[in-house]
């Protein structure tokens, strides 16, 4: 998916300080901006999902994940999204003084459609209205970022 082929949609998402700091550190090392690195990471993860297909995406710990046999997991490529609890640990704190940084993600229509499919797959309360309208993409975005090697290597800490 080529982001430059169509006008990107800007979606600002707040990242917790730990996730942002990992991205910012990589950006400093590469001499780039944190937003550029964050957008590249998200695009890479979305491309992996697109290549594998949404039908081969599963949320860790979900009924579908638990029903998969070892053969299912080893025989085909799967994209395993973090569980809701893991994602929530890495969302910005709403407490007073909770530090977070906003990153503007520039997404193609195809990427937004794929993120919306991921939101529906995650099935997290308050992300989709009763009428089926997507309320927020942040759980999907943070889940994909957490699957990236750079973010995973930063360790298991809460924001």
Language-model segments: residues:
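Short intrinsically disordered terminal tails
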Residues: 1, 120, 157-159
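Alpha-helix boundary/N-cap detector
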Residues: 14, 18, 37, 82, ...
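Short amphipathic alpha-helix starts
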Residues: 6-25, 66, 100-121
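Short, positively charged interaction helices/loops
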Residues: 47-98, 149-159
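Short, basic amphipathic alpha-helical segments that act as recognition/interaction helices
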Residues: 30-58, 127-159
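Helix-turn-helix-like N-terminal two-helix hairpins of bacterial/phage DNA-binding regulators
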Residues: 1-44, 48
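Charged, low-complexity interaction tracts
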Residues: 82-95, 113, 120-124, 130
């Amino acid at each position: 998916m080529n982001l430059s082929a169509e006008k990107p949609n800007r979606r600002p998402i707040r990242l917790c300080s730990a996730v942002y700091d990992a991205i910012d550190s990589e950006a400093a090392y590469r001499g780039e901006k944190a937003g550029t690195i964050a957008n590249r990471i998200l695009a890479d993860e979305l491309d992996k999902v697109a290549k594998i297909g949404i039908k081969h995406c599963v949320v860790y710990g979900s009924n579908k994940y638990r029903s998969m046999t070892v053969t299912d997991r080893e025989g085909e490529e799967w994209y395993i999204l973090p569980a809701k609890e893991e994602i929530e640990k890495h969302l910005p704190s709403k407490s007073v003084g909770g530090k977070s940084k906003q990153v503007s993600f520039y997404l193609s229509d195809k990427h937004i459609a794929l993120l919306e499919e991921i939101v529906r797959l995650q099935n997290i309360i308050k992300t989709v209205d009763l009428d089926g309208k997507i309320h927020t993409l942040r759980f999907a975005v943070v889940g994909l970022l957490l699957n990236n090697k750079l973010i995973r290597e930063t360790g298991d800490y809460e924001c």
